[in-house]
Amino acid sequence: MIKQLQIGDLTARFPVIQGGMGVGVSLSGLAGAVAAQGGIGIISTAQIGYREPDYQVNPHTANLRAVKKEIRRAKELAAGGIVGVNIMVATKGYEDYVKAAAEAGADLIISGAGLPVTLPEAASGVQREDGEIRQAKLSPIVSSVKSANVIMKYWMKKYNYLPDLVVIEGPLAGGHLGFDRKQLEDIEGMHYEEEVMRLSLIHISEPT
């Protein structure tokens, strides 16, 4: 029997978090379908508004509008399933995207491509459109024990908040990772499995 995935008060029937693929791949259709089947559907906010009529003139406004539209539609398709977003820290106007996702009712916000040091602040105190009093779960993407500890210590000190989960991306993940070209040329020699084991042993309530 497949074990459920528990993230605070959220329960996914299957321990599957669909990847956030940008520029029109991970939108409401895919995320809503994954969530409806018991996984966690993820919408990528990267250039999400490319189909909006004013995208070429005002991409920031178009993207924020699309973030809300796609989350609303995904949640309708999900029929109670878990819908989240992936927001890159490198995105211009990053905090605006976080607020838009939180307002639209995203259940989970995953953030990488940099250290999401302002994520808890941007996501807190946001009035959800559905009227629910519930903050989105927050997750940094990390590639090392060092980066995990840095973000947890910072969040705890500044916001008295710790990640609800941590996403680990290794050298084979194909994402925005903390590895240089030389390291990637010798992936087998990295012994990254050992780093994953050390990451899995971090007590999220007690960063070292």
Regions inferred by a protein language model and the residue ranges of each:
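Active-site entrance/lid segments in N-terminal catalytic domains of soluble metabolic enzymes
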Residues: 1-200
